[in-house]
């Protein structure tokens, strides 16, 4: 009979857990360790809180009107982000993250309208040019 094994860990400033069914604890632990290692790898590469992440490089390019070449994994993520933007008629937009500067989602309060309006000119995929593997800020 299969048994449920749980492996709690922390990642991306959150409590996480891997839950796996198996009959061999050692085998299940190996799979859980591989999953947790992959989460750590993704966090290292794409965390907005790490100054050494790929995402930090991309955000730096967006702020200084520069350009950067990205690796294949990041290119696939950008391809997907652009596809989601298109399919959602622009509702999904990776450039909207700048709103975190004025929007404290934990407070339950809306930010000042002027604070939002001041950031809106910096939001929109039209501010970027994506020609694989080159991402360029047009601002």
What are these language model-derived features?
Residues 1-139:
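A contiguous, well-ordered beta/alpha segment that forms the leading edge of an enzyme domain
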